[in-house]
C-alpha cells in the first residue's frame, strides 16, 4: 500500500473538524468574474512651473470614471562638474543628492475636493510609511532615487527621473478609487509644496585646516572628530592636499553646540599640549594633528549653476468603467471609509524629559513619531534628512550606527496611562513586527491600537474626538541645550467621504 493511501485511510473523529462536509478543494481553481474595466495612466500638468521651493497645483481632468494610483514625476537636472582655479577638475569638491531624494523633495502634498481639504500628507510621512509597508526595496529605491549614483559624493551628477508614489487612501486600494464620474460638480485638486534645492543636496568640503603630517590615515568618507576637554566637533573627511597640507572636510555640528570649529594649538598658550588637538577617525582611532597657530578655513560651496527641475508632472491612473457600473456610481449616493493623516507640528526639545501634547480627532488606529537631532539637517550639517538616530555616522553599506533617541515612552489619555512606560525598542522593533509587514530603520517609532495597521479593514481604534487631553511622554537620549532635537509625529485615522449630487465632502470635520 502506498504511503499516501495510508495517510488517506487514517481518518478519525478529529478529522471531522477539518475535512467533514468540505467547502473547498485545492485541486480545482475557483475564480469570480469581475466587472468590465480598463486603466490608463495619463499625464496631468501643473498650472504653474514646478521647481525647487515652489508650491504648485494640478486640477485633475475628468478623463476617466475613477482615479486610482498617482505618481509624481520629477526629472532632476544634471549637476556640472567642478573645476579648480587652474581650470583642472577639482580633486576635492563633491556633490550628492540626499538619500531618498524623491521623498525629500516633497514638503507636503494635499488633495481638495470642491475646494475643501480632504487629506494632507508629507514627504517624511511617505518615507516612514514605506519603511513599514514596502516589500520591494530595490524597485522603490530606483523610483525615489535612493541609489548610490545619486546619494554618493561625486564631481558632478547626471540627470535622473523620479517616480514618487503618493499614498492617499484611493492610491493604496483599488476598492477606494476616487469616483470622478460622481463628482461632476466638484474639482479635484492636488497641491504639492517642494523643498528648496539647498535642503535636498550635500556639497563639500565646507572647511579645511592645515595639518602637520605629510600623510593622513583617513579615507574618503571617513568620519572624523576632535575633542578638547568636554567639547567635541565632528566632520566628514573629503580629502587631503599633500602639497598645501590641507585637510578638507564637511563640518557637522549642532547650531547650539559650544564647540563651533576644529582648532589647533596656540603656541602662546604654554599650558596646552599639541596632542590635545588631534583629529581622530571616529571609528578606528587613527589621527592627524593640526598645524599650530592655524585656524579652520571656510571653503566655497556655491554651485556654478542654478538648479531647476527639467520637468515635473503627475502620472494619474484613470479607471474606465462599463456603462452599468458607471450609472450605478452616478445615480446612487456613495460613502467611502477613508484614512487621513493627522500631523502634529514639530516641537523643539533641549532636555531629555519631554511631554508632547497631541491634537487629534476622529477614530485613530496608529501613531508614528521620530526624534531628530538638529546637527543632522539644515545649513552647516551633513543634511542626512532621514537619519533619526543618535549618531551622524553611517557604515560603508549606508546603515546608521546610532541608536533610537527614544529610550522610554508612554501615551497619556486624560492624564491616565494608555499603557505602562516601555522602552524605545518596543516602539521601534516590536510594534512594527506585530502590526506591519516589515521593521523600519532605527529611530522610527510607532504604537498601534489596531491589529493590522496597514489594512483598510478597521480592527480597533481610539476615538480621539472624545479625549480631551492627549500627550506622549518620552525620555530621550543625548538631548541637551548643546544638542537640540525636534519631534514630529503622524497619526492615521478614519473618516467618511460622502459623494452625492455630484459633490463630495467629509462627514466629520476636524472639530467634530
Swiss-Prot record:
Location of the protein in the cell: Virion
Protein name: Probable capsid protein 4
Keywords attached to this entry: Capsid protein, Virion
Presence of keyword Transcription: no
A Pfam family of this chain: Capsid_N
Signal as UniProt keyword: no
GO MF annotation, one: structural molecule activity
First-listed, main subcellular location of the protein, grouped into a coarse class: virion
A Gene Ontology cellular-component term: viral capsid
Family: Belongs to the NCLDV major capsid protein family.
InterPro entries: Capsid_N, MCP_C, MCP_C_sf, VP_dsDNA_II
